[in-house]
Each structure stands twice: as C-alpha cells, then as structure tokens.
Curated annotation (Swiss-Prot):
GO MF assignments: 4 iron, 4 sulfur cluster binding; iron ion binding; NADH dehydrogenase (ubiquinone) activity; quinone binding
Protein name in the entry: NAD(P)H-quinone oxidoreductase subunit I, chloroplastic
Membrane topology summary: Peripheral membrane protein
Domain 4Fe-4S ferredoxin-type: 55-84, 95-124
Any Pfam family: Fer4
Record's function text: NDH shuttles electrons from NAD(P)H:plastoquinone, via FMN and iron-sulfur (Fe-S) centers, to quinones in the photosynthetic chain and possibly in a chloroplast respiratory chain. The immediate electron acceptor for the enzyme in this species is believed to be plastoquinone. Couples the redox reaction to proton translocation, and thus conserves the redox energy in a proton gradient.
EC number: 7.1.1.-
Catalytic activity: a plastoquinone + NADH + (n+1) H(+)(in) = a plastoquinol + NAD(+) + n H(+)(out); a plastoquinone + NADPH + (n+1) H(+)(in) = a plastoquinol + NADP(+) + n H(+)(out)
GO biological process, one term: photosynthesis, light reaction
HAMAP family: NDH1_NuoI
Length: 166
C-alpha cells in the first residue's frame, strides 16, 4: 500500500508542475497581446538595420596586401585572391579579388581578422537576383558603397515607434 501512496503523490506533484508550466506559457502569450504590430510594407518601408548587421561585404582594393588571411579564416574558403609576386620589391601585388555571395554565409570572419581593415560589412541586404552567377562579386562590385536608405526619398524609413506630439 505504501508504494501506491508515493505514486499518487508523484502524480500530484507532476500535475501541479505541468499546470505551472502551462500557466507560464500562457502568461508569456498574454504579455505579447499588448504589443503593437511590427509588420511593415516592405518595398516602400524599410527598417533601419543595427550597427552590427552583417550585410554585403565592402572591399577596398588599395588597402589589401594579398595576405590571404580572409581565405584561411573563412569556414568555406570562399574569397578568391589572385596575386602576383613582384620579385624586384619582394611583395605580393593583388590582381583580382572576388566573393560569391550565393555561397557566403555572412559569418564576418574575413572582416574581423583582416589585418589592414580592407574588408567591412555594409547594411545592404537586398542581394536577390534571377541568376545566381550575378552574386559573384569582383573587386569592382565589392568596392561600390551601397546606396543609403536615408538618402532615398521614395522609401519611408521606420525607426522604432512613431512619436506622438502633443
């Protein structure tokens, strides 16, 4: 008879614990009911991305020393660096640099470990194309700065919440 009492007590404790977990989940659901909707009309309204947003990579050709650190730290060995050794000055001369954004996972390791800071992350996230080969950017395409959202008069930017003026 004693084991039956302990099983009944365990059943009661498990029931109370389950009810508490369901209640906690329900309270979280109810707390979200007070929030305002965050849906935006995307092509016409855009959110301002954070400073640490990992968008398209910007490349500065003049700063690059062709050390290939970016290739070594990339988990998928993505950046393609073509260089030529100048024997008279015993330095590498960069010929071509390209990144295929169809394969890139935007981890940011290349930007973080670059010794000359020739790579940086931009806020550009609209990289969609109809042909995947257009996502292979060479040094010229990587060197272009993205058009700022703030300067485009056709797009209304959404900050946090609209302020009510009294």
């Amino acid at each position: 008879m004693f084991p039956m009492v302990t099983e009944f007590m365990n059943y009661g404790q498990q029931t109370v614990r389950a009810a508490r977990y369901i209640g906690q989940g329900f309270m979280i659901t109810l707390s979200h009911a007070n929030r305002l909707p965050v849906t935006i009309q995307y092509p016409y309204e855009k959110l301002i991305t954070s400073e640490r947003f990992r968008g398209r990579i910007h490349f500065e050709f003049d700063k690059c020393i062709a050390c290939e650190v970016c290739v070594r730290v990339c988990p998928i060995d993505l950046p393609v660096v073509d260089w030529k050794l100048e024997t008279d000055i015993r330095k590498k001369r960069l010929l071509n640099y390209s990144i295929d954004f169809g394969i890139c996972i935007f981890c940011g390791n290349c930007v973080e470990y670059c010794p000359t800071n020739c790579l940086s992350m931009t806020e550009e996230y609209e990289l969609s194309t109809y042909d995947r080969h257009e996502l292979n950017y060479n040094q010229i395409a990587l060197g272009r700065l993205p058009m700022s959202i703030m300067d485009d008069y056709t797009i209304r930017t959404i900050f946090n919440l609209p302020e009510i003026k009294t």
